[in-house]
Design a protein with these regions (language model features):
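Alpha-helical coupling/stalk and coiled-coil linker elements that connect catalytic or binding modules
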Residues: 1-282
């Protein structure tokens, strides 16, 4: 069994298991498989190049399952993108081999390139993707949608980011005006934005500061200016999070339109993996 299952990918391993569990009875299909194995055995160097690409590819079958169930995560879509990016090289290698080997040429012809899908994923998704997309302003998750993909999303993200820059500028300005060198403007989910002053500096607090919360070693305040800006920032952040989720779901839906074709390619890649691994034994 170890010799039979020296595949480079999880999909290849599953296909070996399927072949062994349900032996083929159709003579033409048996002969096709034998021809592929025999032809791969005659080109070990080219075969290793293809198998190396398969080793570094994503588990396309698994991603497709999650895509169809609409539970796919950002990093998995990144895996789909990486696989689509690798398809031209795989098909080119197989096509070069196929000039002398018709069974391999038949495999190469089954490798679709999905140029439209690849373009979408390249334009829409960040290069480094988080495991989860951020679902609310307090939740965990990271950036998924690439800048310049959607103008409205860019506007909201810039507004939220600009607000945070304003907060840093406010902190520096308040330190200078009050003489409180360790004054801080902070944020937490329960209380929003606030100005924090240590107990040792309370005598320097201006009259227009409104007390918000008393801590053991500090007091927290807000100003009308800070409260107004807080609403602007949080509103932009909430809208940006919602927009990013919407755009991500749109990308998922458009990827789903290619699901049947991707499934065919996933099967072809699994066959390439299995037949090339068996060819290496001969």
């Amino acid at each position: 069994l170890d010799c039979m299952d020296d595949t480079a990918s999880p999909a290849g391993a599953r296909l070996v298991e399927s072949f062994l569990a349900r032996p083929e009875r159709d003579l033409a299909e048996i002969q096709r498989r034998q021809a592929c194995v025999e032809e791969f055995s005659r080109s070990p160097r080219a075969v290793e190049e293809v198998r190396e690409t398969l080793r570094h590819g994503a588990d396309l079958e698994r991603i497709l399952g999650r895509l169809r169930n609409r539970v796919v995560r950002p990093r998995e879509l990144g895996g789909l993108r990486a696989t689509v990016r690798g398809l031209p090289a795989i098909r080119q290698s197989l096509s070069e081999l196929g000039k002398d080997f018709p069974a391999i040429q038949s495999l190469a012809s089954r490798i679709e390139l999905f140029e439209d899908l690849g373009d979408l994923l390249n334009r829409a998704l960040e290069e480094e993707l988080p495991a989860e997309i951020k679902l609310d302003v307090k939740g965990v998750g990271g950036r998924v949608i690439r800048a310049e993909y959607d103008k409205e999303f860019d506007r909201l993200r810039d507004l939220a980011g600009g607000g945070k820059r304003w907060i840093l500028e406010l902190e520096a300005g308040e330190r200078e005006k009050t003489g409180i060198s360790n004054l801080k403007v902070k944020y937490n989910g329960a209380f929003g934005y606030f100005i924090e002053v240590t107990k040792a500096n309370l005598h320097l607090v201006p009259e227009h500061y409104v007390r918000k919360q008393t801590m053991t070693n500090a007091e927290r305040y807000y100003t009308d200016e800070l409260r107004t800006k807080e609403k602007e920032i949080l509103n932009a952040e909430e809208q940006a999070v919602a927009k990013e989720q919407e755009l991500f779901e749109e990308v998922v839906q458009r990827a789903l339109e290619h699901a049947d074709g991707l499934a065919r390619v996933a099967r072809a890649l699994a066959e390439v993996d299995v037949f090339s691994s068996w060819g290496a034994i001969l």
